[in-house]
Structures are given as structure tokens and as C-alpha cells.
């Protein structure tokens, strides 16, 4: 027996009284008391045992029916238990509204998601189960709501799930509903492109709906009064708008007004900008009093541009190699590792500069200036092709570069470098505030495609860095400095850059990354107490297959129960009255048992005859201490010999 100790957020005493099937039954009783028709949606439809279940209330249109999607409103049973009067009032008001579309309230079980037992991932939740059982996702759209335990004043609107995002019509209706009620709100996932690129993973419950083709949005209320925004949303919903599916949008809220930029406006902006860029590059680059020298430099050294790009990509691979093989870097947190990769890239680029000086290759401001403008312009179109909403970020960077292109003094170059960072700061802050440690590895141990994209983003900054090195060389007024002295200036400058990157990594880790990831991992402590879990298997070989019944008995209510069957010979399970997942090796089956199972239940399954297997049952129990959980495991070896 083991004890798992963890430190979750505090829960109210009231909420702890009902869990699992008891909470589902309470939900039914409250709906029945309020005269609402409902039906039960089983999470584990075995027909024998009572597990937690979803409860569905469907409200038909009160106006003549039109071709409209059904609005799904999902509320966890835990939240319903906390705020029954307010939620029942919302259902009643919705029922009385004049609507031309159906509404379904779904009270979901087991949605108070937790990570107590990270080693066991195959557990059911009401929202995912409901979404996975919809026949045709295109006939629905969903609004998921939950109530935050934290007391901050603003409600939150979530617009991404997995790599998918809420369409503009649904986001706009929701935002307008909050604004019209003067309810303060925030949108943590405004930068949709980060999620669509797979750098961050959006809300898991929303992802379950997007997977089934259901458009959705999620609202998190910090105060129960904020639910009036949802009421306003239902009242003012216009079914005809849900035909639009524009997900490439952005918006800005100022005071009580919102400015939306849809996909059409983004495309139009890219086209106009493209004409301006061509004008700047072709017509203006080779004009002025130095036009003849500029043309001469370009014709002689244009191959230097792809060479620099290759050097930039190569520098990232060197940084990546060091992060993987140097222990003091590889053991650091992911933010520090990524910062180290960037710093090593700066060192490699600095060495490349020394190589240029030694071979007397071009180090003129014009060549560097033309390269940075060309690549920043190319970035606009390359990244806009991937996601058009990032156009504004790279366009702003381009204008900063263009209007500071003639900077030659050291201070002006540093200011230019700092200004170029501004368009990306919000992306950096959002990314490191929400990324998980395994996901950030995509930037540290990157493949060819990711390193090329990183290189294109970093390239303008690397060029400004080289322009700074050129300027340092000019400051000394001795262009015939020895390579040793130039190297000294270069690496002193690189040390300054290293200090800046280190400071940035420290501040990001301390005030952004750790705020999201600073939790204490569960601890497993060995202990021996009386047994709560008992298991027994009965086999029957009367048919062509071996039929087995696994009886599980528990002295007290378990929080979670996991069951897996492994066989070293054949497929471990051929059929069962419970859903199960056969793992990659095809020799282990993991059963999907909802949390808070009955104290006594049976699993029926069939296997091939003459197949030996090991059945492992693990149950987790609460203790007198709220922060402790017992873990008991029972393993049974079943011989492949004929059942007796």
C-alpha cells in the first residue's frame, strides 16, 4: 500500500459531501424537483453497475423552427452542486425565451479535472464522453462554462482547444454579450496563431468538441452574477450567423468597443503591403547619391545573403547540440535551455563575423541593411502563408527595420534592436506562461523545419548584431586592427548579449514560467495498513473463447480505479462489457473505468483459450488528511490451462 501526498487547491467543505454517482443522482433530483424533463447519459453503459453519468435537458424552440444548430451549454455537476439556484434559474429563463433554435443543457460528471495520478491517463470525463458520442458535430455548437475558485474580478473567455480555434461569429457574439452587460472580462488566448501552430495546446475539453467538428467556446466565471452574460448571449443569438467559419481573425477591445479584423481584411492588408514592399525594395533601395556603389556592392556580394542564412541555421544546430550534451545546460529548466541555445547561436554568428573580417569579405552597412530588409519582407509573406493573423506582427517589425535602416551610431542600433523586439513580446509572454515542459522541447531539440523558421525570425536580430560589431570596429578608427583585437571586442560584446539573454531568461522563469509550473510533484510513501481492495476472477471455457468475470470489491469508496490486463502471448482482451484501450504493444489492455466507481462491480471480458495473463487492479482512496491518498494494488495471475 502507498500514500500519495499532493497539494491541490482548497475545496469547499460543502462540495466534498457528494462525489461520483451520488452527485449525478443529486443533479437528477434537483432537475426533477424543478419540473424539467431530462435523460441520463451513461459514462459506462454496462447495465449492471451505477457509475457517475451525464444528465441532459433539451429545450425545444418556442418559435417556428428554422434550419439552425443546436446550442449546447455544458455545466459540470460540481459547479451545479455549488450554484444550483442560479443555474436552474438560467435553465428556466432559457425555457421561457422566444427562440428559433433548440438548446441542450448538459450537466457533466467527473469534469473537475485533476492530476493526482499522472501515471494513469485512461480515465473518463463527462465532457469528452458526451462530445465523442455526438452523431453529427456539424449540427451543434457548444458553450462550456465553469466557475473559478479564485476571486479575481474578471471573467475569462477561452477561444482555443488543442490546435483549433473558436470561429469569429461565436467569439464576437460572446464578447458583445459581456460588453452589453458591462461585465469585465479577459481573453487569455487572443494570440490564436500560437495554438494553431502547435506551440501551445488549448483547452482539452474544447479540443474534444473540435475533434468532432463542433464549434465551441468556453466561459469561466469568477462571480456567479457574471452568468447574466450567458443569459444575454442565449437571448440575442442569431442562428443565421453560425454559417460563417472565419477562424483567422483578431480583435482589440478599447473601453467598451471592440475592433475586429477578419480574414478578408487580413488578406487585403497583405496584398496592399506586398505592393508597398516591392516598391520599397526595387525602387528605393538603389536610389540616392550612393546608388552606384550600392548596385556594385549588391552585384558582387549577393551570394552573401544565402550564406548568412545558412550560417544562421547552422548556429541554431550548434546551440541545440550543446543544450543536449552539456550537463549543466541539459539539467536546467526549459526556459534556460532555450536561452542557452540562443546565446550559443549568437557566439557562432560572432565567429562568422570574425571569419568575414579575416577573409576581408564585405562588412558594409549597405549589405547588412539590404539583407535585413529583404529577409524581414520575406518573413511577412512566408509566415502569413502559414497563419495570416501573424501578418501584423511581422509587418510592424518590417516598418521598424525600414525606418531605422540608416542607423549607424551605436546607440541608435541598440534602440533599433529593442524596438524590433516589441512586436514579439506578447507572444513570448503568452508562450512561456502557458507552455508545458515537454512541449517546449520542440524549440530546444528542433527538427529542420522548426530551426529554419526560428532562423528566419532571429535573422533580422542577428544582422543588427553584426551591424553593431561593424560599428564597434569603426569606433576604434583603426580598420586595420589585428584579428586578435577584433575578436576581443566581439566576445566582450557577446558577453553583454549573454548577460541580457540570461537576465531575460531569469525574469521569464521567475515571473512567468514558474507562476504556471511551480507545483510540487506527488510523493509516494510506503506504508502498511488494513486492506480495502479485494479481487477475484471466475473463468468459463464452455464456448470457443474463455469468458471471465472480474469481481472487484472495496471496503470504502475509491477515488479512482484502474484495471489493466497484460498477456505475453496474444491479444489480452477480445471483448468486454466495459470500454478498453489496447496499448501500442498490443499485449496490454487498459479499461476505462469512471472515477468514483461503485464499491462492488464486475468486469466481464473474453480472451483466447490457453492464454496466460496478469490482471492488475489499482485503487486510490482518500484518508482523514485531505492531502493524502492511499494506493492499493492487487495483481492476479491467470494460467492458460483449462478453467476448472
Task: Enumerate the language-model features and the residues they cover.
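Alpha-helical transmembrane segments of integral membrane proteins
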Residues: 268-574, 578-579, 605-607, 611-615, ...
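Transmembrane catalytic cores of multi-pass membrane glycosyltransferases
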Residues: 242-252, 259-279, 319
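Detector for Asparagine
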Residues: 2, 48, 54-56, 114-115, ...
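Context-gated lysine
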Residues: 14-15, 19, 33, 69, ...
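Extracytosolic and intramembrane catalytic regions of membrane-associated proteins
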Residues: 21-59, 67-68, 520-644
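Soluble extramembrane regions of membrane proteins in the secretory/endomembrane system
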Residues: 1-259
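Polar/charged alpha-helical tracts
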Residues: 29-32, 89, 232, 236, ...
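Acidic-enriched, low-complexity/disordered segments with a strong bias for Aspartate over Glutamate
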Residues: 35, 49, 79, 104, ...
Amino acid at each position: 500500500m502507498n500514500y500519495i501526498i499532493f497539494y491541490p487547491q482548497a475545496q469547499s467543505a460543502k462540495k466534498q459531501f457528494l462525489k461520483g454517482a451520488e452527485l449525478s443522482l443529486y443533479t437528477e433530483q434537483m432537475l426533477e424537483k424543478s419540473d424539467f424533463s431530462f435523460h441520463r447519459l451513461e459514462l459506462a453503459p454496462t447495465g449492471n453497475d451505477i457509475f457517475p453519468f451525464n444528465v441532459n435537458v433539451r429545450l425545444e424552440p418556442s418559435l417556428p423552427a428554422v434550419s439552425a444548430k443546436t446550442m449546447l451549454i455544458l455545466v459540470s455537476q460540481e459547479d451545479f452542486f455549488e450554484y444550483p439556484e442560479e443555474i436552474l434559474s438560467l435553465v428556466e429563463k432559457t425555457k421561457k425565451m422566444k427562440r428559433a433554435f433548440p438548446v441542450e443543457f448538459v450537466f457533466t460528471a467527473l469534469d473537475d479535472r485533476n492530476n493526482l495520478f499522472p501515471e494513469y491517463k485512461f480515465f473518463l470525463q463527462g465532457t469528452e464522453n458526451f462530445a465523442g458520442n455526438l452523431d453529427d458535430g456539424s449540427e451543434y455548437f457548444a458553450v462550456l462554462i465553469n466557475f473559478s475558485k479564485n476571486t479575481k474580478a474578471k471573467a475569462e473567455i477561452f477561444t482555443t482547444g488543442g490546435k483549433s480555434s473558436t470561429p469569429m461569429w461565436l467569439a464576437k457574439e460572446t464578447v458583445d454579450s459581456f460588453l452589453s452587460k458591462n461585465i469585465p472580462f479577459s481573453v487569455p488566448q487572443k494570440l490564436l496563431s500560437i495554438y494553431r501552430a502547435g506551440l501551445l495546446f488549448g483547452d482539452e475539453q474544447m479540443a474534444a468538441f473540435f475533434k468532432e467538428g463542433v464549434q465551441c467556446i468556453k466561459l469561466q466565471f469568477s462571480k456567479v452574477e457574471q452568468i447574466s452574460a450567458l443569459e444575454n448571449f442565449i437571448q440575442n443569438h442569431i442562428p443565421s450567423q453560425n454559417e460563417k467559419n472565419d477562424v483567422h481573425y483578431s480583435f482589440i477591445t478599447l473601453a467598451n468597443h471592440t475592433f475586429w479584423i477578419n480574414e478578408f481584411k487580413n488578406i487585403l492588408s497583405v496584398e496592399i503591403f506586398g505592393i508597398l514592399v516591392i516598391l520599397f525594395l526595387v525602387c528605393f533601395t538603389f536610389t540616392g547619391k550612393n546608388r552606384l556603389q550600392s548596385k556594385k556592392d549588391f552585384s558582387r556580394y549577393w551570394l552573401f545573403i544565402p550564406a548568412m542564412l545558412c550560417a544562421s541555421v547552422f548556429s541554431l544546430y550548434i546551440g541545440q547540440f550543446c543544450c543536449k550534451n552539456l550537463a549543466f545546460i541539459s539539467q536546467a529548466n526549459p526556459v534556460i535551455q532555450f536561452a542557452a541555445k540562443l546565446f550559443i547561436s549568437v557566439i557562432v554568428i560572432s565567429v562568422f563575423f570574425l571569419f568575414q573580417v579575416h577573409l576581408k569579405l564585405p562588412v558594409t552597412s549597405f549589405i547588412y541593411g539590404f539583407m535585413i530588409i529583404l529577409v524581414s519582407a520575406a518573413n511577412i509573406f512566408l509566415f502569413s502563408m502559414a497563419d495570416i493573423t501573424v501578418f501584423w506582427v511581422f509587418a510592424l517589425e518590417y516598418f521598424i527595420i525600414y525606418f531605422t535602416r540608416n542607423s549607424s551610431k551605436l546607440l541608435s542600433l541598440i534602440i533599433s534592436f529593442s524596438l524590433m523586439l516589441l512586436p514579439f513580446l506578447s507572444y513570448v509572454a503568452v508562450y512561456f506562461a502557458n507552455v508545458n515542459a515537454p512541449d517546449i522541447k520542440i524549440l530546444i531539440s528542433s527538427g529542420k523545419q522548426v530551426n529554419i523558421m526560428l532562423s528566419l525570425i532571429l535573422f533580422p536580430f542577428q544582422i543588427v548584431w553584426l551591424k553593431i560589431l561593424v560599428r564597434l570596429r569603426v569606433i576604434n578608427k583603426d580598420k586595420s586592427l589585428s584579428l586578435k583585437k577584433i575578436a576581443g571586442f566581439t566576445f566582450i560584446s557577446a558577453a553583454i548579449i549573454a548577460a541580457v539573454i540570461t537576465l531575460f531568461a531569469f525574469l521569464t522563469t521567475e515571473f512567468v514560467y514558474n507562476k504556471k509550473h511551480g507545483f510540487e510533484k506527488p510523493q509516494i510513501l510506503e506504508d502498511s495498513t488494513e486492506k480495502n481492495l479485494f479481487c477475484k476472477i471466475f473463468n468459463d471455457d464452455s464456448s470457443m473463447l474463455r469468458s471471465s468475470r472480474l469481481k472487484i470489491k472495496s471496503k470504502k469508496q475509491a477515488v479512482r480505479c484502474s484495471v489493466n490486463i497484460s498477456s505475453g502471448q496474444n491479444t489480452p482482451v477480445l471483448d468486454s462489457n466495459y470500454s478498453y484501450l489496447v496499448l501500442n504493444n498490443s499485449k496490454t489492455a487498459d479499461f476505462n473505468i469512471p472515477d468514483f466507481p461503485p464499491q462492488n462491480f464486475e468486469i466481464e471480458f473474453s480472451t483466447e483459450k490457453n492464454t496466460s495473463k496478469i490482471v492488475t487492479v489499482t485503487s486510490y482512496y482518500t484518508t482523514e488528511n485531505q492531502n493524502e491518498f492511499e494506493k492499493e494494488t492487487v495483481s492476479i495471475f491467470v494460467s492458460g490451462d483449462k478453467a476448472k
